[in-house]
Amino acid sequence: MSIDIETARRVAKLARIKVEDDALPALAGEFNHILGFIEQLNEVDVDDVEPMTSVTPMRLKRREDVVTDGDQQAAVLSNAPDAREGFFAVPKVVE
């Protein structure tokens, strides 16, 4: 599968990412590079590999489960198209 410039433009629009027209060929190239890597994964022999196992026997690192305030409100709201009084503002959807 090959990604052309129009497909790259459509993906950027769907992802709500502003991409200038002169950057679209590079973006399409990056998409094609990613898809090429994914196609290489199809060549890996996984017949004898159990699903959901790791290639190295490791336990996951665990952390203490504590409640925090997160302190991320400003960072999260900086991505919002419209934020008011510390909350996401969205159009009314119910009459």
From Swiss-Prot:
It catalyses: L-glutamyl-tRNA(Gln) + L-glutamine + ATP + H2O = L-glutaminyl-tRNA(Gln) + L-glutamate + ADP + phosphate + H(+); L-aspartyl-tRNA(Asn) + L-glutamine + ATP + H2O = L-asparaginyl-tRNA(Asn) + L-glutamate + ADP + phosphate + 2 H(+). It comes from the Bacteria. GO terms for molecular function: asparaginyl-tRNA synthase (glutamine-hydrolyzing) activity; ATP binding; glutaminyl-tRNA synthase (glutamine-hydrolyzing) activity. InterPro entries: Asp/Glu-ADT_sf_sub_c, GatC. Keywords: ATP-binding, Ligase, Nucleotide-binding, Protein biosynthesis. Transmembrane segments: none annotated. GO terms for biological process: glutaminyl-tRNAGln biosynthesis via transamidation; regulation of translational fidelity; translation. Pfam families: GatC (PF02686). Its EC number is 6.3.5.-. Gene3D superfamilies: Glu-tRNAGln amidotransferase C subunit, N-terminal domain (1.10.20.60). The keyword GTP-binding does not apply. HAMAP family: GatC (MF_00122). NCBIfam families: gatC. Allows the formation of correctly charged Asn-tRNA(Asn) or Gln-tRNA(Gln) through the transamidation of misacylated Asp-tRNA(Asn) or Glu-tRNA(Gln) in organisms which lack either or both of asparaginyl-tRNA or glutaminyl-tRNA synthetases. The reaction takes place in the presence of glutamine and ATP through an activated phospho-Asp-tRNA(Asn) or phospho-Glu-tRNA(Gln). Heterotrimer of A, B and C subunits. Belongs to the GatC family. PANTHER family: GLUTAMYL-TRNA(GLN) AMIDOTRANSFERASE SUBUNIT C, MITOCHONDRIAL (PTHR15004:SF0). This is Aspartyl/glutamyl-tRNA(Asn/Gln) amidotransferase subunit C. It comes from Dinoroseobacter shibae (strain DSM 16493 / NCIMB 14021 / DFL 12). The lineage of its organism: Bacteria, Pseudomonadati, Pseudomonadota, Alphaproteobacteria, Rhodobacterales.
